[in-house]
From Swiss-Prot:
Belongs to the intron maturase 2 family. MatK subfamily. Its main location: plastid. Keywords: Chloroplast, mRNA processing, Plastid, RNA-binding, tRNA processing. The lineage of its organism: Eukaryota, Viridiplantae, Streptophyta, Embryophyta, Tracheophyta. Usually encoded in the trnK tRNA gene intron. Probably assists in splicing its own and other chloroplast group II introns. This is Maturase K. GO terms for biological process: mRNA processing; RNA splicing; tRNA processing. InterPro entries: Domain_X, Maturase_MatK, Maturase_MatK_N. GO terms for cellular component: chloroplast.
Amino acid sequence: MEEFKINLERDRSQQHDFIYPLIFQEYIYAFAHDRGLKRSIFLENAGYDNKSSLLIVKRLITHLITQIYQQNHFLFSVNDSKQNKIFGYNTHFYSQRIFEGFAIVVEIPFYLRLVSFLEDKERVKSQNLGSIHSIFPFLEDQFSHLNYVLDILIPHPIHLEILVQTLRYWVKDASSLHLLRFFLYDYPILNSLIIPKKSSFSISKINQRFFLFLYNFHVWEYESIFVFLRTQSSHLRLISSETFLERISFYQKIELEVFTNEFKAILWDFKEPFMHYVRYRGKAILASKGTSLLMNKWKYYLVNFWQCYFYMWSQPKRICINQLSNHSLDFMSYLSSVRLQLLMVRSKMIENSFLIENASKKFDTLMPITPMIGYLSKAKFCNVLGHPVSKPVWADLSDSDIIDRFGRIYRNISHYHSGSLKKTSLYRIKYILRLSCARTLARKHKSTVRAFLKRLGVGLLEEFFTEEEQVFYLTFPKVSSTSGKLYRRKIWYLDIICINDLANYE
C-alpha cells in the first residue's frame, strides 16, 4: 500500500494532476487485481498473477481507441468469449482489468481530497464510521424525538451520460472522460447494467464496483443540497453539518441556478433544526420534528429538484409520508419503530401514596422473519413455508466443511441481527440451518436424520452454532445476569461493512 502511494504521488507530480496517464501504469492494475481478490481497499501487498499483463492492457486500449476513429466497433460478449479475442487473448477478461483499473483511477482524486481534509481538520480516522451498524445508534438517539418520516425510494438516472456529466465537476481530465464515455456507449451490455426494478435499481455483477462508484457519486451530489440548506439556514455553523469533501463548484452552481430569486423563501420553508437524513443503497429516510405540511413541502421539493437539475425521473408515490408513532420502517433488514413505553412510579407523601404514569418513546428494532425465510428459501436451505431441506450441491464436501459453512452462515446472520430486540426470529433461523445441515449430512451418508444424529450426537452441530453466542459474554464480562436476559440485549457491532450474501456460498 505504501509503495502504491509513493508511485501515485510521483506520477501525479509529473502529470500535473492528469489521471489519464495513470491508466497505463502497471501498479494500478496490480493493485486493482489484488483488491478484487481480497475485497479490501487497504492492502499490505499488491501482488498479482501472471494473467494480468500490462502489455496486453495497453494493446487493448490502443485497439479500442483505433476502433473509435474507424467506427468499426466490436462487442464484448460474456457468452461468446472464444470469438472475442485480440492478439490471442480474451477481450472480456482484459476489459474487466481495464474497468477495475479505471475504477481505482477515478477514485484517486476523491481519496486524496479526503486525506487532505482529514489532515487539515486533524480528525481521527476510524473504521467504525464505515460500519453499517453505526447507523442504528444514531437512529436510537434521534428518532425517538421526531414525529414524521419520509420513506424515499431513490430514482435511478435515465441515461448513463448523466453519470459522466456529474463526474465532470470533479475530474477535469477530458481524456479520461472520453474514455469513460467510450466504455459506456460502445458496449450495449454495459448500457443495460442499470435496470429499474420494483424498489430501486439493480446492477449486474459485471463491473459492479465501477458502476456503483458512478451511481453513489451521482447520489452524493444531490445529497449535498441537505448540507447546503442546513448550513445556510443555521445561525451557527455546526461541525456536524460540514462535509468531508468540500464542493466549491457545487455550491456556486446552487447559488447561481437553483436559488436565484426564491432562495430566501425556500430557507424559510425548510428551516427545521431537527431534520435527519439516512441512506443505504437505493433507499433513504428523511425524518423531522415538524408537521405533515413541512414533510409535504420536502416531498415535492425533492421530486422537482431531481427532475429539473439532475434529470432523474421520480414519482411522488415513491416518497411516502408516515408518522413514526404508528409506522414501522423497513430499513436495512430491520423493522424499526418508535413505540410509547409506559412506566408506573409509586410516590408517597406523608401518609398518602399515589401512582404516577410516565410515558416515554423508545426506538425498537426487530428482525423480520418472513423476508429472511424467503432469502433462505431462495438459497435452497428451506422451502417457502420455512421447512428445512437438504443442500444437495454441498453433499460432495467433507463433513467438517459442510458443518463449517452452515455454522458460518448462521454466525453471519446472528452477528448482523444482534440488534434485534427479540431473538425469536434468530432461534427459528438457527433451527432451519441446523436441521438443513443435518439433512445434508444424512443425505451424504445415505442415512436418516435421526440415525445420523444418534450416531454422532447433537453436540457436533451445537458446537458450530453456539460460537456466536459466546461473543455476548465477551461484550459484557461484568454482567451477572443469566444467559437468557443477556441474549435479549440489543448489541451493535462496529465491524460490519457489508451484508453477507447467502448466494456467495454456492
